[in-house]
Amino acid sequence: EDFVPLLEPLAHQLPNIRGYLLCREAPQEVATSLPLVGEFETLLAEQPSHYDFPSFDENGVATLFYTTGTTGNPKGVFFTHRQLVLHTLGEASTFQAPGFELLNRDKVYMPITPMFHVHAWGVPYTATLLGATQVYPGKYEPEMLVKLLVSEKVDFSHCVPTLLNMVVSAEAI
């Protein structure tokens, strides 16, 4: 819901988007001109317990993210389904190394690296595969991030140095 006011003035530039999915803690109405398809938790609860996934080409494009432009202008990079699965499996084997278990069913994970930044390094996919509880902060406000880290008893997180500096400089610490 935090991004609705940012998306509304841009919606006319996004003609291929047929609807928006709202993600929030509690389902409630949001006043917006955007075509909402629903709220994530409500839609999830309404789904049948079984779903027959359609076949698709593992080499087909699955996602698009943008580089930060470290060596030039930012650019879009496509990832295939196969690349995401192989990355997730490789990362999972590392995160499950004996004596090094960063993520598993008993762990709580909260990314501070946003998904648009290199898929948050792919860790959300790995956390899902390994059954970790996941906490997604929404806005990147330092005090709120610190409160979530503590209140949700986060075991594992990651971020870029700029965000880490914001968090450790927060008044809540």
Sequence positions of predicted segments:
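Adenylate-forming
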Residues: E1-L10, E25-P27, T113, Y140-E143, ...
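Structural core segment of the AMP-binding/adenylate-forming
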Residues: E1-T42
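Structural detector for helix-capping/boundary residues
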Residues: F40-E41, N59, H81-R82, T113, ...
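Conserved pre-ATP/AMP-binding loop-to-beta segment of ANL
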Residues: E46-Y66, N73, G99-V108
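Conserved AMP-binding A3 loop
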Residues: A62-G90
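Conserved AMP-binding/adenylation subdomain of ANL enzymes
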Residues: V85-V108, F116-F156, S169-E171
